[in-house]
Amino acid sequence: MTLLANSKRKPTLAHSGANGRLFMLELSGGRIHSMRPDGSERKVIVSNCRLPDGIVVDVAAGHIYWTNMGSSPSANDGSIERADIDGRNRKVIIPQGVTHTPKQIHLDKAGGKLYWSDREGMRVMRASLDGSNVETLVQTGQGDADARDQTKWCVGITIDPKCKQFYWTQKGPDNGGLGCICRANIDMPKGQTAANRSDIEVIFDDLPEPIDLELDLKNRVLYWTDRGDPPRGNTVNRAPIDVEPHLGDVPEIVLTHLMEGIGIALDVPRDRMFVADFAGSIYAARLDGSDKRDVLFAQGNLTGIAYADI
């Protein structure tokens, strides 16, 4: 179909589907895949990862960064690696023993930092892009007893550079309705620590099981996946961030019928999102959830996903 110059109708996602590139993690196979957003040119660029979960792309430097949860939650052998965008020159930048179970990860290119959530470590962490200067920003618990309390498990992470804040999810028990989304200032309050900082806000609570977070900085909207039970779980949700949070507010659901939704990536200039679920599907849709379509189906247990305009 040819769109006339004066047509007010939006093109469908298929018209811009091949722009950019997706990077996705296959947990079951321990692999990183790269492909066009329409599913073409798919290839494996990294193999032999130890339960990969979150991924980000630094286009300017030509790097990808990803988290490995490690051999098992009890082993405390998670790590973070870096490689070139084509998968070459792989390097461990956060070795085993520094972070317990690293989950989703966020790149703050301007600030020169990587942020990530550590599930069994019950913390939000960050480091310089070379893996140095590791810091703990939030510590929700300590010890084995706390580590069994899933309400303390940190999973998703994103930052708001404008307001100098970061957001994270605490997922709660599987399908438990005890998940929450929190935020705090990037700068630690003077005289306080990751375990006792007083600036933490809970902006949504009683969520089924929130996982990954992404911010649409242009429109000031927070998006997240939830892998809990329907009707509010197995969804993509969104909410504006520049309004005063009121616990009990119900966020807008924009996508439904996921099969344990995990990763989410936004391409705001082209009005589209990409979502990965644990049943092995990749979905594309507009930011309002319309024009949903399948990109991949039943391709292993998929976790993190990232979009790069390359």
Language model features with spans:
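Conserved loop/turn at the beginning of each blade in beta-propeller domains
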Residues: S28, D38, N48-R50, D86, ...
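Short loop/turn segments immediately following beta-strands, especially the blade-tip
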Residues: S128-L129, A184-T193, A239-H246, L287
